[in-house]
Regions:
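P-loop NTPase switch module centered on the Walker A-proximal segment
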Residues: 1-99, 103, 143, 212-215
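Conserved nucleotide-binding/hydrolysis micro-motifs of P-loop NTPases
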Residues: 16, 28, 78-79, 102-105, ...
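Active-site phosphate-binding and catalytic loops of NTP-dependent enzymes
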Residues: 31-58, 81, 147-159, 191-205, ...
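Canonical P-loop GTPase G-domain recognition
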Residues: 122, 132-192
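A glycine-rich phosphate-binding loop feature that marks nucleotide/adenosyl-phosphate handling sites
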Residues: 161-168, 204-213, 350-361, 387-393, ...
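Conserved nucleotide-binding/hydrolysis modules and their immediate coupling elements
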Residues: 206-310, 319-322, 486, 494-545, ...
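Long insertion/accessory domains within large nucleic-acid-processing enzymes
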Residues: 258, 263-266, 399, 445, ...
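Charged, conformationally dynamic linker/hinge segments
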Residues: 295, 303-437, 448
Length: 614
């Protein structure tokens, strides 16, 4: 047992300030030099993480405080990245539960806390943002206590210490109105209450790999906590897994420990510390690295199954290969299977077609982040509409995933939101009137019903609605849900959109393109005002004659086009439509590009339906 080490994960709902808190802990423990320029949210290292202000991958860091070494793991707050959180909990002995002093306990708080309590982790509660207008720290503490009781915490876990803080300003204290300009109360509480890691350094080595990193110089790096023994550089080890009998030998060519934000090479790393191991080819998450004298694999945490799937397809549009660097099915296949090695909550399967791969994940956000990442890496492909993964019980009844949805809205929009969710088969389970005229609504809603809801909520509440959801359980199928009530405007020829063609088309619906945009036959160029697909020609040019007429040369006034994000495109498309993704563009298109192909496919489906009825 190493008394001078503490391993802790920071868990919280999205946007409650985890990454900002880690920033302050690093600053105040002397990790950065006095003259060092440091960006905000230093733990969010990916471009997409910094742009969206969310954490996607959990990160490791370490601080030294009064002779103690505190290893900190910053975890994602979105339920879609819950697979990251679940396995990270295997590396730590305690959790720092961060709760917003205004918002209180949210669905993601419940999800991660349940996992932590089941694994017997010691909690420390930090009530953050106590300086926020409308903060209610004491009420939030009562909410946290009720949540602990509801989740079946034991007596030791219920006796949790509380620290109040404002991570943005770097202040903390044991009472909300007695804050000091330092993070010392948080450091002291961690050292006093979080147990030191168990294990005997005189026993043979045993490390469970919880995270994988990659380095161009040394290759794959396995990161995990040393459960017992000591890791020594250049020593032989055996890699094994609890799921199968196979063992393989390897040598630890390099060892790293975490100091601040850097990985530092070490000759030996002791029990209880978090270590990064290099030199083991093909190491993957869930494997155990042991000494050759005692090959004993450790069980890995159960990761919840994916709930949403979509097809990744080779791009077959007329513009294929113009903008992307990696466009073949082999490129896409290799990239997807590489993703699965580190993204434990994701699944990739081959399909009957060599050009399509079925990718399953925790939610729309989980999959759209992968699409955005691949796009930035130079990949070009098409994706289908996300579909919910159904199951059948022992009696053969159809089951579907149900999500617990929490919506915070101003009172005047409450009726509109409830009406919208009613059409999506949602059931209201709780309603809480909050201060400052807002209401918190809690629903049980099928995962199918959430597709496309986020953008509708923002429209209905004029940007004031906040939603978050979390997987609850599989329950009996709730019935059909009404889909998009409007059709698509489909380009009839390939060319360049121009003002004349767009002006004549805009009265039929809302447009997605502007003059000068390259267009191909079968591309979706707008949303029809009626519930049918209409073929339009936005490339049509005005015939030039040598006759002049008054009023014929007036300037054409065009309505500005709608610009969709990747998530909005995935929400908009129907089953017979695809989203084409390239490094420079995101376009929507029909699966069958020509009108003749679409009519043939429609007739084929109709004929199959008649045979089925007979």
């Amino acid at each position: 047992m190493n008394e001078k080490i503490r391993n802790i994960a920071i868990i919280a709902h999205v946007d409650h300030g985890k990454t900002t808190l880690v920033d302050q802990l690093l600053r105040q423990s002397g990790v950065f030099r006095a003259n060092e320029q440091v960006q905000d949210r230093v733990m969010d290292s990916g471009d997409i993480e910094r742009e969206r202000g969310i954490t996607i991958l959990s990160k490791n860091t370490s601080v030294n405080y009064n002779g103690f070494r505190i290893n900190i793991v910053d975890t994602p707050g979105h339920a879609d990245f819950g697979g990251e959180v679940e396995r990270i909990l295997k590396m730590v002995d305690g959790v720092l539960l961060l709760v917003d002093a205004f918002e209180g306990c949210m669905p993601q708080t419940r999800f991660v806390l349940r996992k932590a309590l089941e694994l017997g982790k010691t909690p420390v509660v930090v009530i953050n943002k106590v300086d926020r207008p409308g903060a209610r720290p004491y009420e939030v503490v009562d909410e946290v206590l009720n949540l602990f009781i509801e989740l079946g915490a034991n007596d030791d876990q219920l006796d949790f210490p509380i620290v109040y803080a404002s991570a943005r300003d770097g202040v903390s204290g044991y009472e909300p109105d007695e804050l000091t300009h330092s993070m010392q109360p948080i450091f002291d509480t961690i050292i006093q209450h979080v147990p030191a890691p168990m294990g005997d350094e005189n026993e043979p080595l045993q490390v469970l790999i919880s995270t994988i990193d990659y380095d161009d110089y040394v290759g794959r790096i396995g990161i995990g906590k040393i459960e017992r023994g000591v890791a020594v550089r250049n020593r032989s080890v055996v890699v094994c897994c609890a799921d199968h009998e196979e063992h393989r030998e390897a040598r630890l060519s390099r060892l790293y420990r975490f100091e601040g934000l850097k990985r530092v090479e070490a000759e030996t790393v002791g029990v209880g510390d978090i270590v990064a191991l290099a030199g083991i080819p093909g190491i993957s998450i869930g494997e155990t690295v042991c000494a050759p004298t005692a090959v004993e694999p450790l069980p890995f945490v159960h990761i919840d199954e994916p709930t949403v799937s979509m097809d990744f397809i080779v791009n077959t549009s007329p513009f294929a290969g113009r903008e992307g660097k990696y466009v073949t099915s082999r490129n896409i296949r290799d990239r997807l299977f590489k993703e699965v090695e580190t993204n434990v909550a994701m699944r990739v399967e081959t399909t009957a077609s060599t050009d399509a791969f079925k990718v399953s994940g925790r939610g729309e956000l989980h999959l759209s982040i992968l699409i955005e990442t691949m796009r930035r890496q130079g990949y070009e492909f098409a994706v289908s509409r996300p579909k919910v993964i159904m199951k059948r019980d022992e009696q053969g009844h159809l089951l579907e995933p149900i999500e617990e949805l929490t919506v915070d809205v101003p009172q005047e929009y409450m009726g509109t939101v409830m009406e919208n969710l009613g059409t999506r088969r949602a059931v209201l389970t709780n309603m809480i009137n909050e201060n400052q005229g807002s209401v918190r609504l809690v629903f049980d809603v099928p995962a199918r019903g959430l597709m496309g809801f986020r953008s509708e909520l923002l429209t209905e509440t004029r940007g004031n609605g906040i939603m978050s959801h979390i997987f609850k359980d599989y329950e009996p199928y709730t019935g059909e849900i009404a889909e998009r009530t409007r059709g698509s405007l489909i380009a009839s020829e390939t060319g360049e959109a121009n003002s004349y063609g767009l002006f004549n088309t805009q009265e039929r619906g809302r447009l997605f393109c502007r003059p000068g945009d390259p267009i191909y036959e079968g591309q979706i160029v707008g949303e029809c005002s009626r519930n049918e697909d209409i073929t339009v020609n936005v490339c049509k040019k005005k015939h030039v004659t040598n006759m002049r007429a008054s009023g014929s040369d007036e300037a054409l006034r065009l309505t500005p086009p709608l610009e969709f994000s990747l998530e909005q495109c995935l929400e908009f498309i129907r089953d017979d439509e695809l989203v084409e993704v390239t490094p420079k563009s995101i376009r929507m298109r029909k699966r069958f590009l020509t009108k003749d192909q679409r009519i043939k496919e429609f007739n084929r489906i109709q004929a199959q339906g008649k045979e089925y009825d007979e």
